[in-house]
Amino acid sequence: MASQGGPRRSLSVTTASLHGKKKSMDMAERGLDTGRRSLTVSRSPLGLTGGERTVKRLRLSKALTVPATTTIYEACKRMASRRVDALLLTDSNEMLCGILTDKDIATRVISQELNVEETPVSKVMTKNPMFVLSETLAVEALQKMVQGKFRHLPVVENGEVIALLDIAKCLYDAIARMERAAEKGKAIAAAVEGVEKSWGTNTSVPNTFIETLRDRMFRPSLSTIIPDDTKVLKVSPTDTVLTVAKKMVEFQSSCAVVIIEDKLRGIFTSKDILMRVVAENLPPSETLVETVMTQNPESTIVDTPIVEALHIMHEGKFLHLPVTDKEGDVVAVVDVIHVTHAAVATAGTTAGIGNEATNTMMQKFWDSAMALSPNEDDEDSRSESSMKVASEAETGKSFPFANTFSFKIEDKKHRKHRFISDTRSLTEVITAIIQRVGDDIDPDNFPQILYEDEDHDKVLLASDSDLQAAIEHAKSIGWKSLRLHLDDSREGKGRRRRRASGSAESMEYVETDAWAAAYSGVAAGAALVAGLGFMAFLRKFGH
């Protein structure tokens, strides 16, 4: 792995130092490249302060560990039963000696036509997988994972592998912060333009600067990260698993899209080979892809914002997302690491204004995204053991932070928009709405904001307490997102409002005009805060 962000100290750890509890070892996954051969681990830089987050404070998971003498078939069965796509291997002394992933199964086993019931995993595993120490800075470990393009990394403490770091979980935390920052930035730009129009003046900020904020940071689409020469592995539903596995090696891809009559009808990944073929003991040379593929997979278009693509994969719990053009032809398949790298690079390009040249774009992103806010310090009150290894049976929270929630809204062109916002402030939600459907909003007739409850009633959101009550109710019935509606009809005096105090089910009728005035006040507050923030931004960067 290439070093980033300045010099690092490293410590080579032999497998002999990894003695201890076999059951405490955690899974690691080799990425798409083959660079994870060294057992070198990076230590945290000197001068670590209490405010900097270390690896052991990130989301960690359990893993599966088996002897290297285990047959490939048995290993795959174990992985399938635990619903994991990688496992660690130990030698006769119970020392960590390798790792096996679903990609290894596809490219090193099936494509090579090995006998899975006779071949031990030691023949196809990646030896000496990379890992990090528990005191390593979180930003350093995450940065290395993105650059190296692998999702899982074992975490070592006192010579034992104690946990697994999954970059996908950490990524969504960081992206949620980046998205909120982007939303605030767009509100800043909009506020400045509004002042110019109202006062008939022109600030010292060139329009090109505002356009840069919009185009490079706030609205980058997948089309900006997909090369023109991208090759997509397209197969027929009647192709055999063996044929597709060989093509995966040829295309250096971990997935294939299944096309019927020029339309996307399925997706087949290396994880499917592991879970649905090998673990089920199906013959690859006789099994047709159409019997083991994921049918009618979710896809998106090239104009989809990068952050939106990440949300789609996160909510759908999959790692590959087909991308189509306007005609519906698949032009690319992006994975979570690919999109992450692009999102970080895009954010870093803009955020790098005025910063030291020695910092890399990814380092800036992780440093900013993982920085602790005052109320996050409460996380330290949790037990250290629960921070180290999270139970696989634990579902966990649906959202990256206790004070955030997911929202959906549809514009007048029937396009759906999804965003995550702070649940403590209606101003934050309004800012996000303006960002996405601002063209639908008449500034002289600001709409009411409503949400749809489980009875399909439209309930008013007119204050911070209304918002908090709505979120509490949504969580209590197991919802992961709240569907919002805008009503600019100035009719419907019978709209209902859920009170934050008292019974969660209590409702009261309110006058529409009164709440319209409240919305106007909130909107004015959002513009004022945004304008002040923009001026501070200009002073900081010398514009």
UniProtKB/Swiss-Prot annotation:
SMART domains, alphabetized: CBS, PB1
UniProt xrefs under Gene3D superfamilies: CBS-domain, Phosphatidylinositol 3-kinase Catalytic Subunit, Chain A, domain 1
Keyword Transmembrane helix part of the UniProt annotation: yes
Membrane topology: Single-pass membrane protein
Modification sites for Phosphoserine: S17
Transmembrane regions: 518-538
Domain CBS: 59-118, 125-183, 225-285, 293-350
UniProtKB keywords: CBS domain, Membrane, Phosphoprotein, Repeat, Transmembrane, Transmembrane helix
Protein name: CBS domain-containing protein CBSCBSPB1
Species the sequence originates in: Arabidopsis thaliana (Mouse-ear cress)
Biological classification of the source: Eukaryota, Viridiplantae, Streptophyta, Embryophyta, Tracheophyta
